[in-house]
Swiss-Prot record:
HAMAP family cross-referenced by the UniProt entry: Ribosomal_bL17
Superkingdom, taxonomy of origin: Bacteria
Family classification: Belongs to the bacterial ribosomal protein bL17 family.
InterPro entries: Ribosomal_bL17, Ribosomal_bL17_CS, Ribosomal_bL17_sf
Listed name of the protein: Large ribosomal subunit protein bL17
Organism: Campylobacter concisus (strain 13826)
Description of how the protein assembles with itself and partners: Part of the 50S ribosomal subunit. Contacts protein L32.
Gene it is expressed from: rplQ
GO terms, molecular function: structural constituent of ribosome
Amino acid sequence: MRHKHGYRKLGRTSSHRSALLKNLAIAIIKSEKIETTLPKAKELRSYVEKLITRARKGDSNAHRAVFASLQDKETTNKLVTEVAPKFKERNGGYTRIIKTRVRRGDAAEMAYIELVAE
């Protein structure tokens, strides 16, 4: 039974799931909008919002914490110096999920996930 299970497994092993979320997070930070399946988008929202909250502090410890999660210098710098300052006055709700279509091959619900631009 699933009672209060804290996250979606997405049909993957633990390491595969963490790699997937890391790669999706890098993609959304670089392009600010991506299309993926709805369950992945919902799981990614939680992951990215925690990163942005950490990055908002802007100090070297925040930089290290974000880099530990993303393992990508370019993306970490963009998140800490460009993306996070936009959300300085916003308490959460940094992303938006918009349902788009049903994928033809497997009827998976697709959605855009994007960073909210004020």
